[in-house]
Amino acid sequence: MSENELKDDCLFCKIIRGEIPSYTVFENDDVKAFLDISQVTEGHTLLVPKKHLTNIFDYSQADGQRFLQYIPEIAQAIKKSNPAIKGLNIFVNNGEVAGQVVMHSHIHLVPRYSDEDAVSVPHVNNADNYDEARYQRVADSIKDNL
């Protein structure tokens, strides 16, 4: 990626340019992976495209292919780095309403050591609020936009 694809006022663009230090675990022309400063659990890593994309809604198909292909490699390296790791959460917050804080697309890879880690990924079951017609209406609306 070229420097002109980065923004001056973006925290992650500054990290990519080396203006702000990071604990980098992987870097190539497309992505940079570094430890999240918060370390939700030990090894919490961010995978960041070297092209400024605000969130998934800015991705072209080529952006997705170029960036997302590194998830397995980084995830496997995290798992191998510590035998105490039992699992891994991979998540992305897209937009403020979804919890995105830094407006540069990034993927969180959060190692899990036990089911008592301080990580919470809520799962709400709203199936009782859906009948067959509503499921079909939602599915059709998404399908019509592909």
Segments and roles (model prediction):
Residues 1-146:
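HIT superfamily nucleotide-processing domains
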